[in-house]
């Protein structure tokens, strides 16, 4: 954190402002998401201080403050889960996953990422955000185990979350997923639109996302009976194995 001070309408203000994405708290992240898509500079000011003071700044103060937040231009390699917990409409608290997905099983991931690719963030939230397990001892996953039936029950609440909360959950997930795609570049491919060719005149086509189930089954080969074992492994463990297999296959050509 960095301390800044300035004067507005004859009154002196002091604020401790974040110097990186990792220093933002959940409320500041929500403020950024709420206005960032429309006015990034305003988002920076509101992240730094309360919005009443922020909108009262002079043009020179505005310029000076936005320079303090140039780090916000870099949304690459962000490794923090800002939305650590969510309060549902019925008052129940759902807890999120580790920023590195180390407490997310491969089965959870295949469900969550598939729904994320379809823009069904309410379902993705119901997969990754869950109630606290009664026997939690701070040494295990805080959340109750993932099940498809539990997800359906949680959807009754996640489908009622306000739009801003869903946008925050979605952006945070995309940020953390980007770290995985950068680290495991051999196995991730995204639905990027192909350029329209002048020869065919065809409309751009979207490439499909990585088919996780197909990748796993290719890796298992004849050992299909081990599928459940892989589904129970953590996301980093499976991605590491997949990446290694792909590299070996490429080098063997």
What kind of region is each of these model predictions?
Residues 1-253:
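An amphipathic, hydrophobic-aromatic interaction surface with interspersed Lys/Arg
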């Amino acid at each position: 954190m960095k301390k800044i001070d300035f004067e507005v309408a004859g009154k002196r203000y002091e604020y401790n402002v974040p110097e990186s994405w990792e220093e933002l708290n959940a409320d500041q992240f929500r403020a950024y998401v709420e206005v960032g898509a429309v006015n990034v500079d305003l988002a920076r000011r509101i992240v730094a201080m309360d919005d009443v003071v922020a909108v009262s700044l002079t043009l020179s103060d505005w310029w000076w403050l936005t320079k303090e937040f140039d780090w916000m231009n870099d949304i690459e390699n962000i490794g923090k889960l800002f939305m650590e917990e969510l309060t549902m409409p019925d008052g129940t608290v759902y807890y999120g996953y580790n920023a590195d997905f180390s407490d997310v099983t491969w089965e959870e991931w295949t469900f969550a990422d598939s729904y994320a690719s379809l823009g069904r963030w309410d379902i993705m939230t119901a997969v990754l955000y869950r109630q606290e397990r009664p026997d939690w001892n701070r040494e295990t996953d805080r959340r109750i185990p993932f099940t498809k039936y539990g997800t359906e029950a949680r959807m009754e609440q996640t489908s009622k979350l306000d739009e801003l909360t869903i946008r925050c959950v979605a952006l945070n997930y995309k940020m953390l997923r980007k770290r995985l795609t950068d680290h495991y570049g051999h196995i991730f491919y995204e639905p990027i639109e192909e350029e329209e060719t002048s020869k065919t005149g065809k409309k751009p086509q979207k490439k499909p996302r990585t088919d996780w189930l197909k990748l796993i089954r290719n890796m298992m080969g004849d050992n299909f009976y081990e599928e459940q074992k892989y589904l129970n492994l953590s996301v980093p463990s499976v991605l590491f194995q997949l990446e290694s297999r792909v590299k070996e296959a490429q080098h063997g050509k």
